Amino acid sequence: MNKRMIPTLVLALASMCGWAKDIVVSPAPYAIEQALQQAREERRLNGATDVTIRLQAGTYRLYQSVVVRPEDSGTHIIADKGAVVSGGVRITGWKKQGKVYVADVPEFNGRPLEFRQLWVNGVKADRARDVSDFEKMYRIRSVDKKTETLYVPAAAVKKIQNAKHAEMVLHEMWCVANLRIKGVKIKGDSAAVTFHQPESHIHFMHPWPSPMVTTDGHNSAFYLTNAKELLDQPGEWYLDAKAQKVYYIPRNGENMSTADVEVPAVETLVSVEGTPDNPVTGVTFEGVTFSYATWMRPSISGHAPLQAGMYMTEAYKLRPKTVRPNGDHKLDNQGWVGRPAAAVSVNAATNVDFLKCTFEHCASTGVEFHQYTKGGSIKRCTLSDLGGSGILAGSFGPEAHEAHQPYNPSDARIICTGLSIENNLVTDVTNEDWGCVGIGAGFVRDLRIVHNEISEVSYTGISMGWGWNQQACSMANNLVQSNLIHHYAKHMYDTAGIYTLGSQPHTTIEGNVVRDIYSPGYAHDPNHWFYLYTDEGSSCISVKNNWTPTDKYLKNANGPCNVWDNNGPEVADSIKAQAGIVKE
């Protein structure tokens, strides 16, 4: 046996009675899993009640998700500086072909490796696309829902008309859709573009959000990606999945003989997974860096989101509209949604904490507390360079639950309750799925989102609530306080620094600072942005003492008992100064 394949497990007896144990781990295959197993044995055989796994510096490369189970309750995983839990695979052996470098893609777990992201020396490279400046994106000309066809300028698609795996990323009000191109037919100065199933059917059936065709020049913009014909700029790459070759044009200063080129291979790096009756309890992650998680669903099924990155699995328009109770708008659409993957996922767990961790270089969500969770915290963490949302809290409804309906599960334990999200830096997230959010919460109770700084997001800073109706549901007692949100709405409008949906009794939004919104020229409505935005069904929410440069707010189809008080530039400087991360 190769001794280097065995993790170094140094067991230090902290008590003669065996109450506490330290397990020190160095990087090796399955090192973390073996340490967790060792900790279980210390509890089973020696009665240890307090076990710490210490990750020494280095990269812990995974073959699959690390699963933290109920048997691991009470474990503290603490990382030394430089300890990285990685789902990445390194690409080496680059050879120059003109201005392009090419390398073989290794197999992963005995299968061809496909990926949608690539990083060079920790900097995300661009999947080959037709424009480097998004302000120069082409716009669609018309939509034929019956034939599931988009008509676009012929010049936009001339390069990729014979490409087999090209994709269109289509700007649709508050979401972007990833549509795999099936066919391009050019006639004159126009081209008909069709798409693969299942996303084509879903995309052309659902009414909201929809591709825009207007009379004022704000037709939906789009860009094209994933075709070798588009590979022409430094920092761009293309994967030929069939040949298992990857092509890259280096940026200035990059030496491909020494560069660390990483692609993601594991979808969820760590899954904390209990059961409703036997939750994982009292687990802490401290100082751990989680990097290079993948999410391949858009390459398999496309991606047609409803909102906040939640992709539709079925959707269609209602004719006539459904009359709803309690003064809600008539409902003109139906939709069922799935949830994007997260690099770290927590389900059925009590008091799981992430302290001073880093979530970076991932395809989708950074960290989520999904369902059957109680307590727990995400504190003093950094979330950056993520394709999707930074943090997601709570369920957005099971996949069988229609998204516009109130959600009141008979087993209330399913609701994410008592989570604290405090003093985190969330920046450069949503850099791939522009419709995602900095921090997003679905059906939650007793949630605290306080003293975070959120910047460089494509859409909304903090989105809280779900359901588009004012009927009583499982949301209540949430707090959004003293957050600093700036440089948001980088790509999407119908947005706000802080946005709410649904009835949330005893919920407070207070003492936040929202400023510095982007002005993308391709937004569907250049005036439809806000600092604070209570959307459909928002009810029983107190919005007070929030500093914004002006009072540009929207209250759309709200329910009863909302209170707005003292918001705007007149808010006291002392309140304004308290927003954002509190120094230790």
Predicted regions and their residues:
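Bacterial N-terminal signal peptides that target proteins for export
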Residues: M1-P7
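Hydrophobic h-region of N-terminal signal peptides that target proteins for export
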Residues: L11-W19
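Extracellular polysaccharide-degrading/modifying enzymes targeting complex plant/algal/animal polysaccharides
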Residues: V25-A348, D353, E399-S410
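The right-handed parallel beta-helix/beta-solenoid scaffold, focusing on the short coil/turn
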Residues: T49-V51, G58, Q64, S73-T75, ...
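Extracellular beta-strand solenoid repeats
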Residues: R54, R61, V67, H76-I78, ...
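Short glycine/acidic-rich loop motifs that flank beta-strands on beta-rich extracellular proteins
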Residues: Q64-S65, E267, T294-I300, A341, ...
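Extracellular beta-rich repeat passengers
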Residues: D126, D130-S132, M296, G511, ...
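Right-handed parallel beta-helix
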Residues: T281-Y292, K330, T350-S364, T373-G388, ...
